[in-house]
């Protein structure tokens, strides 16, 4: 089997590192570096386990894209710290001690020569979805703690799997179409697309998506298993001769405007204009700029984490 392309959900991983690694871990100058250490250590573990020859850290260049807000104004509204005028991305509410650590992580990635991928006006989910969907050569492993990305699982044209970090990296679960179908009771032949439709119907308070009132995850899964797709569910709800319960029909038809708008909000983009920070996504076996990498590691107090990353890279074939 070919070595995989590993796509890391940057924000998901450094948020989890920030909250999962003690804040007592600091740089020599006293600045917290718990997220930096946790992120680099997690990346080393993923490289050791998955043995990729290509890797990209995917970024939110716009964590709350305007096209999604235009469709569902409540989308992530509760996480806005400071609205920005003139179409600029709103400022996200982020712990004060995390923001400077994100800059440190990106400095280290740049010095090491590890690719960072982003697309103006799009979230990291869209970057991950675009890169996974357009891959035609290597199997893809998406690493994230965001369940929304289960919609990208696929078997063709290349296997796309999601390493879900919901309970942490040590207890991560690998999902493909079969696992998504089994876990959520969805049609196996379109498990990824069906998961997006499940999320749309169920809603997601953490993203400000209301869902269809009175339709929870179990009901949504039952509807998808019975009818096959969201379009077919709505066709059945619109059919007076349907066997669908009257109360459920009423709920779905009352929410038809939301369902239509939310479809584009919930589904990740697969055509985002993604660019890389490096010429290719080839995973470097040694730091591109060893002097700068060493200087940053010393300044941030993460020499041991960089050593663990290098040890993981040393196990890969040249």
Swiss-Prot record:
Keywords: DNA-binding, Exonuclease, Hydrolase, Nuclease. Its EC number is 3.1.11.-. It is an enzyme of class 3 (hydrolase). SUPFAM superfamilies: 5' to 3' exonuclease, C-terminal subdomain, PIN domain-like. One of its GO terms (biological process) is DNA replication, Okazaki fragment processing. It comes from the Bacteria. It holds the Pfam family 5_3_exonuc. This is 5'-3' exonuclease. It comes from Mycobacterium tuberculosis (strain CDC 1551 / Oshkosh).
